[in-house]
């Protein structure tokens, strides 16, 4: 099939060249229609030969996963050569596991989404007296998801996970632990190289809880649905936090900024930015998010779930 692949103006800014270069190397006929390295692209259909291909692994694991998934249709098996440090490595492992399961006649088990659960862990950090029950998750030691690390990360911060069978977990905050993390004179540092999707929820809730932080190995967050480092710095400034970012880190050292009475957050058309700042309403009591409907990309029922735990949500047209 011949055709044009295009997307929203926001996603047009995401670099696509590592994937296009890899596909061209195995016979794909792809042409950039506007900016070199970014969508839209024109694809002329044809059979791909497969075989050895090199791909830059330092921008997004999605390029690797895409090649792995479609390689079953190629004439020759795929042999991937990865350049640079692999970011979001657990997603590559998850793709590998899925392909292995597809060789089995039994139906694969589809887990609940740990990255989506991170926003409710964030809520419990901000409202430690209220428990939250989440279903459909697999215990971290059984899960194929790297983002299952959220349970250990939040345990350190003071949110405990109490399992009731393999699939249902009750979250509750431990004020003593939360207060001890808040009183630390140096920032809590986490390496987020394998779990970048957890950064927005963690950054917003830790700042609102008064816990200083420094997240490293986050350079690939500049190439998500938005430049998430820049988006977090800008929007967290609106709620009073002087956040610093660099090539490969984002941090908050406790410094505060003046905050306006009416907070209007731009979602940057990024579902994780919208969800992270929605949770902030638990502490700020009132917040407006422009473009909040973008949460439908990964969590269509998000606002409905927030209503269940007491949020009042109003759509402004």
Briefly describe each language-model feature range.
Residues 1-317:
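Short, structured segments at the rim of ligand-binding sites
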């Amino acid at each position: 099939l011949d055709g044009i692949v295009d997307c929203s103006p926001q996603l047009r800014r995401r670099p696509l060249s590592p994937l296009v270069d890899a596909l061209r190397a195995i016979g794909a006929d792809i042409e950039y229609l506007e900016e070199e390295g970014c969508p839209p692209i024109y694809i002329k259909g044809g059979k791909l030969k497969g075989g050895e291909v090199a791909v830059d692994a330092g921008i997004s694991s999605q390029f690797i996963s895409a090649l792995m998934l479609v390689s079953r249709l190629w004439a020759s098996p795929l042999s991937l050569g990865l350049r640079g440090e692999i970011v979001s490595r657990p997603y590559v492992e998850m793709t590998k596991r899925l392909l292995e399961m597809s060789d089995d006649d039994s139906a694969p088990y589809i887990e609940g989404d740990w990255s989506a659960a991170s926003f409710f862990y964030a809520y419990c950090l901000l409202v430690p007296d209220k428990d939250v029950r989440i279903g459909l998750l697999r215990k971290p030691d059984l899960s194929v998801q790297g983002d299952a690390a959220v349970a250990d990360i939040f345990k350190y911060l003071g949110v405990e996970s109490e399992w009731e069978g393999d699939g249902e977990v009750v979250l509750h905050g431990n004020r003593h632990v939360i207060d001890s993390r808040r009183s630390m004179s140096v920032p809590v540092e986490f390496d987020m190289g394998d779990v970048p999707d957890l950064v927005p929820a963690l950054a917003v809730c830790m700042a609102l809880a008064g816990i200083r932080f420094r997240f490293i190995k986050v350079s690939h967050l500049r190439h998500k649905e938005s430049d998430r480092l820049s988006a977090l710095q800008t929007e967290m400034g609106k709620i009073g936090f002087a956040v610093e970012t660099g090539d490969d880190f984002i941090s908050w050292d406790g410094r505060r900024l003046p905050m306006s009475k009416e907070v209007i957050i731009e979602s940057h058309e990024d579902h994780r930015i919208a969800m992270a700042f929605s949770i902030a309403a638990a502490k700020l009591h009132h917040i407006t998010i422009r473009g909040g409907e973008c949460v439908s990309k990964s969590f269509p029922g998000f606002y409905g779930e927030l209503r269940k735990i007491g949020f009042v949500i109003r759509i402004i047209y």
